[in-house]
From Swiss-Prot:
The lineage of its organism: Eukaryota, Fungi, Dikarya, Ascomycota, Saccharomycotina. Plays a role in tubular endoplasmic reticulum network formation and maintenance. Works in conjunction with the ER shaping proteins (reticulons RTN1 and RTN2, YOP1), and in antagonism to SEY1 to maintain the network in a dynamic equilibrium. May counterbalance SEY1-directed polygon formation by promoting polygon loss through ring closure. It is found in: Endoplasmic reticulum membrane. Belongs to the lunapark family. It comes from the Eukaryota. GO terms for cellular component: cytoplasm; endoplasmic reticulum; endoplasmic reticulum membrane; endoplasmic reticulum tubular network. This is Endoplasmic reticulum junction formation protein lunapark. Residues 258-278 are annotated as: Disordered.
Length: 278
C-alpha cells in the first residue's frame, strides 16, 4: 500500500514538474519571439529616420564644402565640380553602407526568429507526443462535436431532437418519391401542397400543419365568402386583416374582436337617467 502511495506521490510531482518545465520553456521562447518581432518593426522606422538625417546633413555639408571651395579658390570651376562629386559620392556611399548594415542585422534577426519558431513548434510537437494529444483530441472531438454524426447523433440527442431528425429524413424520402413520380406521371397539386405544408410545419418547430385541428397553432387562410384557399398561414391566436383577391371580401378580425369586447361590457346609464335615480 505504501509503495502504491509513493508511486502516486511521485507521479503527481512528475506531472507538476512536467507542466512547469514546458510552461517555462514555451513562455521564454514566446517572449523572445515577441521581442524579435518588436525589434524588427522598430528597426525599419529607425533606418528611415537615419536615412533622412543622413540626407539632410549630407546636403548641408555639401553646401558648406562648395561654399568654402568657392571662397578659397575664387570660384575656380574644376575645384567646385570635384568637391561636389566627392561630397555626393560620399553621401551615396554612407547611405549604401547604412542600408547594408541594416540588412545584415535584419537577416540575423530573421534567422534567429525562424530558429526560435522552429524550436517552439518542436516543443509543441514533443508535448503532443508525450501527452498523446493527437489521439485524445480525435476522441474528444468525436464524442463532443460528433465527427461520426450518423452514429453519435442517435446517442447524444434527446427524444425531441431525434423525432425532428426522423421528420426531416421522412421529408427527404417523400421529396425523392415526388421527384420520381413527377418524372413518370406528373405530380398533383394537392400532393405538392401537402408536402410543402409539412415542410413549413417542421421549419416552424411544430408538427404537421392541420388547419382543421384545434390544437394546431397555425391555420390556413380561407375566404369565408367564396371559400378560396390561399397558400398562406396565420397564427390561430392572433387576429388578422385580410382582403380576398378573388371576391374582395374583407376579413377584419381586429374590429370584430373590439366589437365583441364592447358588447360584453354593461351599458353605461345616461346623464338623465342618473338624475332621475337621484
Amino acid at each position: 500500500m505504501f509503495s502504491a502511495l509513493g508511486k502516486w506521490v511521485r507521479g503527481s510531482r512528475n506531472d507538476k514538474d512536467f507542466v512547469t518545465k514546458y510552461t517555462a520553456d514555451l513562455s521564454q521562447i514566446t517572449s523572445q519571439i515577441h521581442q524579435l518581432d518588436v525589434a524588427l518593426k522598430k528597426s525599419q522606422s529607425i533606418l528611415s529616420q537615419w536615412q533622412s538625417n543622413l540626407t539632410f546633413y549630407g546636403i548641408a555639408l555639401t553646401v558648406l564644402a562648395l561654399s568654402y571651395t568657392y571662397w578659397e579658390y575664387h570660384g575656380y570651376r574644376p575645384y567646385l565640380v570635384v568637391t561636389a562629386l566627392l561630397c555626393i559620392g560620399s553621401l551615396i556611399l554612407f547611405k549604401w553602407a547604412l542600408t547594408k548594415l541594416y540588412a545584415f542585422y535584419n537577416n540575423n534577426r530573421l534567422r534567429k526568429l525562424a530558429k526560435l519558431r522552429a524550436i517552439h513548434q518542436k516543443k509543441l510537437e514533443k508535448l503532443k507526443e508525450e501527452t498523446h494529444y493527437n489521439a485524445t483530441s480525435s476522441i474528444i472531438q468525436r464524442f463532443s462535436s460528433g465527427e461520426d454524426q450518423n452514429d453519435d447523433a442517435m446517442v447524444l440527442l434527446d427524444d425531441e431532437l431525434n423525432a425532428k431528425y426522423q421528420e426531416l429524413n421522412n421529408l427527404k424520402t417523400e421529396l425523392e418519391k415526388f421527384k420520381k413520380e413527377s418524372h413518370v406521371k406528373g405530380l398533383k397539386k394537392e400532393d405538392s401542397d401537402a408536402w410543402f405544408d409539412k415542410i413549413i410545419s417542421v421549419l416552424a418547430g411544430g408538427n404537421e400543419l392541420d388547419s382543421t385541428s384545434s390544437l394546431s397553432p397555425f391555420k390556413k387562410i380561407i375566404c369565408p365568402q367564396c371559400h378560396w384557399k390561399s397558400n398562406c398561414y396565420r397564427l390561430a391566436s392572433k387576429p388578422i386583416i385580410f382582403i380576398c383577391p378573388h371576391c374582395n371580401h374583407k376579413i377584419d378580425e381586429v374590429k370584430e374582436r373590439e366589437d365583441a369586447i364592447e358588447a360584453k361590457q354593461p351599458a353605461q346609464p345616461s346623464q338623465s337617467e342618473k338624475e332621475k335615480t337621484k
